[in-house]
Amino acid sequence: MSKEKTYLKWYNKVGYGSGDVAGNVVYALLTSFVMIYLTDTIGLNAGVIGVLIAVSKIFDGVTDIIFGTLIDKTHTKMGKAKPWMLYGFIGCAITLIGVFAIPMNMDDFAQYAWFFICYTLLNSVFYTANNIAYSALTALVTRNSKERVQMGSYRFIFAFGTSLLIQAVTFQFVEAMGGGANGWRTVAIIYAVIGLIVNTISALSVKELSDEELADSETKTEETKYSFGEAFKILVHNKYYMMITVTYILQQFYGAMIGVGTYYAKYVLANENMFGTFAWFINIPLIIALIFTPTIVQKWNGMYKLNKYSYMVATVGRLLVAVAGYMGNIPLMLAFTALAALGQGPWQGDMNAVIASCSEYSWLTKHKHVDGIMYSCTSLGVKIGGGLGTAIVGLLLDFSGFKGTLTVQPDSAINMLHIMYLIVPFALDLIITFILSKMNVEKANAEIKEKLGISENEVVMESQN
């Protein structure tokens, strides 16, 4: 059995992974802090914010597939995905600052409009282009499955490391920058500049494979000719794509619920800085799990069993967090939070490699290369799951009687915070575990190859020739 060809050096993998520093200065800041910034600093209504975010999500499903298709049809000296990754983040930086720079002298309607425009452009246009392109690079810079897993692990180590720092220090950082609206604006500017620099370094650290290595002229013609409708059919007929998309949406919805921790720490635990403490107990175990994921995947000859069993651990962990939370036992909450995060880590590390396997499944069944649009599930999940999660948080807070101008919240609001932060994450983990138990795309690909009487190397050669 011939050894699988390698394409990347260690610094390529690290450089690629650093790109999620940029992605998470946007994502972590939005999901963890935008709602509490709008309600407690600007003084806007949580329910109205929730409705605006929900309306904004209408645009997202369309733009994900559009940008995925555009990436597949792009041919430049830089490659297919890198131009979109580079230029997309310029817009991300500008609109991120806009979201956290709402003028205090505007009336309420103008403030809501300002937020809606900046938020929609950030999510539906610029973050979409950047994130899909960044994710698609996994399939465009290497054909080695182990390297893809390693890229995913490096990526999410940087992602969770960035999330940890942002969640741990942002409240204090805002105060250090003067507090209030000016403090939030200054912090957003600093985060945006950091993201812009790191995103550029990441994009320039890897080189996309040539067209000759990816496909021959006949295949390239096929790729550029499929229509939007055909691309949509390819996706919806790939059951594994649909599973990953739903899973990713649920994960990001989960993240939005965990983001309620800003309110939970401030109004239930009476110490907003406890949000940063919980961030440590979430992100450090995630990073530890990511470090060991490539080794375990290699030892177990695949990703399916690891993903399924580790998420079972995560589900048990979140159940115990809920029990400890209602007991009021913070040390136990922290311990079980760490256990849940440890179980969630492997899927975060090998998810991009699973998506690449889904893309291979489409090629084996439909004979179409759709690498760019296949990775639309990542951006789609981030925006629909995270966005709608944030929207629902706002609506539920408003429904419960929460008001950002109050120092002490009513019992109904406190009860709602318990439900959102303790019960909902457990339920979401339970559903994700069930989906992962059905997501054995590696086995499906192997069975198709066996039926066709071709080897792994022949599949790669066929996809390249």
Name each region found by the language model.
Residues 2-464:
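Membrane-embedded alpha-helical bundles of multi-pass transporters/translocases
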